């Protein structure tokens, strides 16, 4: 199955919901105010958020108000508006320095460690030498999981005893990367609730210690977001960004939700790059974000 097919399949819960609702909304062919209001409610219920949904409807009304339209025409117009909104997110990770330090964070249970493993596999496939740092020292299972990925992609693996200081492991990993001539350092951190200040401050400490090795590092700080959390993802990103400079996001579990509209809401609000999206457990279920493919998939086109 191609990535495009996987993406459409992964977004089917959201696209089916939107398509079924559009049939209900468009009992009339004319795009009048009542129909626009119903369409706006539909977008909000798909987790595009109030502000984003209103923006989309305003643009749609500007071109098509009181005109006769088909459902397919509306889908096509909506897709074009979404593509425009999502363009700021269309930025891949560029490996510009050596070692290029990538810090990955997120709340508990969002698929963070698996995502790091998949990133490592993709970087290795591109010929990069990798060092992986297990800074989630609170869970032996997380260390073990990352070690499996490191072995699989033949990466240098740096860890410490359970409950050891995560910042010191990050520091050691960058040291090791310089010694073994790694191109990339991938740093896994413990999942943390964004409303726990002490854990968020620990993340700030990791960043401060990393900067002792390289003032410009981390070169990327990625927040992994579980799409099934819907609008809660906005408060996650806001809070993490207060403590550390989030440079981009990766959105996982899009296949498990009818809330994939949150992707649009996040980009509209933060204008932040989406480095990748995930639609399943397998290695090739994570891929670079493409605004056009995503927008068309979201609308079942």
Where in this protein do the model-derived segments appear?
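N-terminal accessory targeting/assembly segments
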Residues: 1-19
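Residue-level signature of catalytic and energy-coupling elements of molecular machines
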Residues: 11, 47-49, 107, 136, ...
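Alpha-solenoid HEAT/Armadillo repeat architecture
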Residues: 12, 27, 44, 65, ...
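Primarily NTPase-proximal linker/entry elements flanking Walker-type ATP/GTP-binding cores
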Residues: 17-135, 142-163, 168-187
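Short hydrophobic/aromatic residue motifs in ordered secondary structure
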Residues: 50-52, 139, 255, 283
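Conserved catalytic-core segment of NTP-binding enzymes
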Residues: 145, 165-180, 194-300
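Short glycine-rich anion-binding loops that position phosphate/pyrophosphate groups of nucleotides
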Residues: 190-192
